[in-house]
Amino acid sequence: MNTATGVIALLVLATVIGCIEAETRADLQGAFESYEGEAAEKIFRRSPTCIPSGQPCPYNENCCSKSCTYKEMKTATPVQRCD
């Protein structure tokens, strides 16, 4: 076993031991059960984002300007882009 392999093995071992120790701590037991209902929804809810001007837009409501029009590209193919 060379030095690099030994270092990697020690890091893996330390990580495993740390995870086991964290699971047995009383202050972390049941930590995820406290996230119920609305609190859990807030964690996993996506924040509203909008598509900036000049970017392709699938729907008008996703554009920051709330406006999406067809524009002709160099290939003469019209593409919907945010205004």
Curated annotation (Swiss-Prot):
Keywords: Calcium channel impairing toxin, Cleavage on pair of basic residues, Disulfide bond, Ion channel impairing toxin, Knottin, Secreted, Signal, Toxin, Voltage-gated calcium channel impairing toxin
Any one GO MF annotation of this record: calcium channel inhibitor activity
The keyword Nucleotide-binding appears for this protein: no
Any one Gene Ontology cellular component term annotated for this protein: extracellular region
Pfam family, one: Omega-toxin
Tissues where this protein is expressed: Expressed by the venom gland.
Biological process according to GO: defense response
Major subcellular location class: secreted
Signal peptide residue numbers: 1-22
Cellular localization per UniProt: Secreted
Protein family: Belongs to the neurotoxin 08 (Shiva) family. 01 (omega toxin) subfamily.
Protein name: Omega-hexatoxin-Hvn1a
Lineage: Eukaryota, Metazoa, Ecdysozoa, Arthropoda, Chelicerata
